[in-house]
């Protein structure tokens, strides 16, 4: 692996990794919203607020379903195939370790040789 964190070659496949990460985070947030709305619904006495929360709960469940279906269609999530999901989780863990081991802030970051003058020169 090229250890130069500014080299564009190190960004190969990053958009795909980012998409899966964002989708999983969105799914988790949608699930969290459904859970929090359900708790709020059980603790509300006002009929108007209960109706509003019930509507939000249904919308949250629909959003969760939509995100899940998108992830399944793109093969980013395998809720019914545990061995496939395990492989994805292992790959994710491997990538996390790889990024964690990258020297993202090397001692030498001087890129002065890449430019013919400093920014202050006109």
Curated annotation (Swiss-Prot):
One protein family per Pfam: Coat_F
Q: Where in the cell is it found?
A: Spore coat
Keyword annotations? Sporulation
Gene Ontology annotations of biological process type: sporulation resulting in formation of a cellular spore
Query: Which InterPro entries does this entry report, sorted A to Z?
Result: Ferritin-like, Spore_coat_CotF-like
Q: Which family does it belong to?
A: Belongs to the CotF family.
Entry protein name = Spore coat protein F-like protein YraF
Q: What is the lineage of its organism?
A: Bacteria, Bacillati, Bacillota, Bacilli, Bacillales
């Amino acid at each position: 692996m090229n250890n130069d964190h500014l080299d564009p070659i190190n960004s190969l496949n990053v958009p795909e990794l980012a998409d899966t990460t964002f989708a999983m985070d969105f799914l988790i947030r949608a699930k969290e919203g459904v859970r929090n709305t359900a708790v709020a619904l059980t603790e509300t006495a006002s009929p108007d607020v209960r109706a509003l929360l019930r509507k939000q709960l249904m919308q949250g469940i629909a959003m969760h379903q939509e995100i899940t279906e998108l992830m399944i269609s793109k093969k980013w999530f395998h809720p019914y195939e545990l061995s496939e999901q395990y492989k994805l989780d292992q790959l994710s863990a491997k990538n996390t370790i790889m990024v964690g081991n990258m020297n993202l802030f090397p001692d030498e970051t001087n890129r002065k040789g890449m430019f013919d003058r400093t920014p202050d020169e006109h």
